[in-house]
Amino acid sequence: MSTEGASSRSRLLPTLLGILLLLMGLAMLVGGIKLVTLGGSLYYLLAAIGFGLSGALLMAGRRAALGLYAIVLFASTVWALMEVGLDWWQLVPRLALWFAIGIVLLLPWFRRPLTGSQSAPVTTGALSVAVVLAGLAALASQFTSPGEIKGELDRDAVPGMTNTAPAMPDGDWQSYGRTAHGDRYSPLKEITPENAHKLVPAWTFRTGDIPGEGDPGETTAENTPLKVNGMLYVCTPHSQVIALDPDTGKEIWRYDPKISTQNAENFKGWAHMTCRGVSYHDEAAYANTATEQSAAEPAAEAATATASNSCPRRLFLPTADTRLIALNADTGKVCEEFGDHGAVDLRHNIGSFAPGGYYSTSPPAVTKDLVVIGGHVTDNISTDEPSGVIRAYDVRTGKLVWNWDSGNPQDTTPIAEGQTYTRNSPNMWSMFAVDENLGMLYLPMGNQMPDQYGGDRTEDSERYSAGVTALDINTGKVRWYRQFTHHDLWDMDVGGQPTLMDLKTADGVKPALLASTKQGSIYVVDRRTGEDIVPIRELPAPGGAVEGDHTAPTQPRSDLNMIPPELTERDMWGVTPFDQMLCRINFKSLRYDGMYTPPSLQGSIVYPGNFGVFDWGGISVDPIRQIAFLNPSYMAFTSKLVPQAEVAAMGPRKGETSGVQPNKGAPYGVILEPLLSPLGLPCQAPAWGYVAAVDLTNNNVIWKHKNGTVRDSSPVPIPLSMGVPSLGGTFTTAGGVAFLSGTLDQYLRAYDVRNGKQLWEGRLPAGGQTTPMTYTGKDGTQYVVVMAGGHGGLGTKKGDYIMAFKLAD
């Protein structure tokens, strides 16, 4: 009796493991059958049978379980290597669990109680070989870098190339993109690849503007400060402006516009609460510029002089309650002569909109005589939304000078009182680029609402959407336009600020415009005419839109691009074989014909997703080295059209980029979601984010490295370097160091522009989804500054921090 009891106890462990294997096999069998019926891989069905039978044999105490498990593990290893090669993160869901169970089966407590006619050394040996082979595959994968490009820039300058951006002191950062050209290039050289590792915190300032219960989920700290006029100017999500001492971070003055909820109970229902920046205008900068003044208008001339004298240096603040406010940059007091006691009400001639449904999240463009502003329009609410009009005001008086409405593009004469701009015309919510020498403003354009249905779009709205339009600064008339997505059904707004630089080409130096896009193309055109510098090809695109809509037969693609390969079933990922299998089932259940697969009732995969390869963070360039520094991200989304009769039952939407979007007035609402596993992880395999550099003289990628860790986005804070998405921009320096803070983990990082080597990282107290900047303080020290306030949509930690770093003394 005691012998039987001991035998039962000794078989307990293999029996329990057998039950577990059998249950896993049954679960995989159900999913495997589903996947096969969808035309997917046979592996999961066959592996389910093998692992399930191994479990049953273990429960029966049969030694044959080891031999069968060895066969299935060996076959799984061969299959995994055939699918993905030596890619560690791709091998994890395919082999890690089965490898671990194989090791457990080799333990004496699990294998010794087993009996049968098979030789114990043979079955144990076979399993040992299978385990070793799987382990060797995992070990070998540690020495590979799939998706990366290793290279080195072989120059510090291209002969004859200079920085032709608007002049300013080297130590200043006067515009959102440092200059109106949006290049984000600083001529500072104190920080170099040799000393960047010595960067340390210099000071920290807290704005006090922290998201509260009454704020929208998409409350974001996306501000890039300005350093000019001996001060550092910051704006906060609730449109406060704070002037800081650039050396110490101490507050000099603060302006709070006390934004209105626009008759709502609070801000919670708003799509966004964002201020990406303010704009600066200095009369002295134009003092030597010839001006044209009309002797016939002495009153206007006198008013301009009065405004200039009272606010010779001014900041322009777009507020979340739809105002444009002019502030004295020295004191923070409003410039009373601008508009109505310092403010222009941007609601004029716009018509009705929901609270928070229209305002500028981005800084206006400022020229010698004008301040020019666009506006954010909440996506996918209805077909009756505010106009995307661009308005130019006198920089001193706030008088409307011209307006360009893409729904009425020929008439730029200031609109009459009582009239309304074209409803629902394509808008420009991002940042302008300006070339005052050429007399042009460059607009990165969005599209007509809703994003995923275009059956009722007008000819004008189609013409000017999802591309770049160049306007004459003085008149607002169109000089040229280029479209980068035809009949956009995927929310492929041009989100980033266009970048202006002189580019060395085979035909000589040309004034270029670079437009980074969500699709991954970087379009390079002559900014005088819009003609190609880098070839742009029209490629066939998938068809088959829903009834009432259509697709464009072709879509443009630049020869300079960071477009990822099309997804396949084998690209689906998970932590375990089970969530990976479910992702494969999801992939095969959705429509996917490659990039530009149209939205569908079935549900379609959008890849790259509407966060883009490049979003509003854009790119930075080094005009001397003739390179671009990039932070591409790769995340798939899904887009499922829903008949309007079903939309109301689905409840309110979660946000502007997820959940059901009502699209009132259109035949369909739409459900937008990232393509995630049941565990909330991306269904596509990592890496999801990189840093890269492109040689603009030949359009070759010099280097490309995965970037960022999952430390702050996984349940266990382990800094696994998987390459995570980033949202926000970069900047480069003459010292050869580039900076980025927008990754999902809370770090500001420095990189060697020659080879992409990470030189340093500084821990941030909150998410850094913004664009950092650099300047020289009054003490002659180079500082790097970033706002760390988090991003609601990405779920990064919220805060109210401005952090400055410098080299250790």
Residue ranges, per PLM feature:
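Extracytoplasmic/periplasmic/luminal assembly and interaction segments
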Residues: 83, 170-212
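N-terminal amphipathic, basic-rich helices that act as targeting or association modules
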Residues: 131, 135-170, 192-196, 201, ...
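Extracytoplasmic/lumenal domain signature
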Residues: 197-210, 241-269, 280, 285-291, ...
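N-terminal pre-domain segments of enzymes
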Residues: 137-188, 552-563, 567-576, 656
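Repeat-blade elements of multi-bladed beta-propeller folds
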Residues: 173-176, 218-238, 269-323, 356-382, ...
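Short, solvent-exposed loop/turn elements at domain surfaces
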Residues: 180-186, 209-215, 242, 451-452, ...
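Long, low-complexity segments enriched in small/aliphatic residues
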Residues: 433, 555-637, 645-646, 659, ...
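Topology signature of small-to-medium multi-pass alpha-helical membrane proteins
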Residues: 1-152
